[in-house]
């Protein structure tokens, strides 16, 4: 079962996704000292004897990447993966991107968080599975069962909220990690930097074609665990 921890600015749904035994991957760690929850994810992992194999970013907005410095300090060997079109939002170029966004949101007090954003270690490539994405970045999971579990998670490039937004889908377990693309009763904003109404529409059509409507949805904010068909029932009203 996917565990959800609300972290960082705006209470991002940080996801701990089990693979096999103690192994898992972490999606959108947002915990940071300025938000008073910098140890929320690392404590959860250690208290449950979990071993993260990757930090996965559904996109590069400041509220979803705030926890990267803390996570990399605790687990320096664990790779960070993001779509190449959002890659410049972290690493050396990340501070400039994030500073502009948080200033526009009136959150300049958070700027310190983004001074040491780690670089991306690999790309989340559309149509690939997480095992292949890790392998291409030079990382070996080191556990055959965990590797097989990673192969079940496929990457869907879903631009619209940002150019590098992605979703993750496990067809076997019918779990769908939607980032800020699909929410309960809403779709992602397109009025921020890198957003696009037309690309969002295309991405929602792609999700409709690709993902079972019985899949349980884990978005980047708010309610988790609803069936995808509930979103498309809502969407049909427009």
Region spans (language model):
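Short catalytic-loop micro-motif centered on adjacent basic/acidic residues
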Residues: 25-28, 54-56, 155-157
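Short loop/turn motifs at secondary-structure junctions
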Residues: 22, 51-52, 213
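Short Gly/Pro-enriched turn/cap motifs at secondary-structure boundaries
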Residues: 5-7, 121, 157-159
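Beta-strand-turn-beta hairpins that frame and shape the catalytic cleft
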Residues: 1, 17-24, 129-154, 170-175
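Active-site HxH/HxHxD metal-binding segment of metal-dependent hydrolases
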Residues: 31-35, 42-148
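Conserved beta-strand hairpin/beta-sheet module of binuclear metal-dependent hydrolase folds
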Residues: 1-48, 168-179
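Metallo-beta-lactamase
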Residues: 31-33, 97-99, 136, 146-238
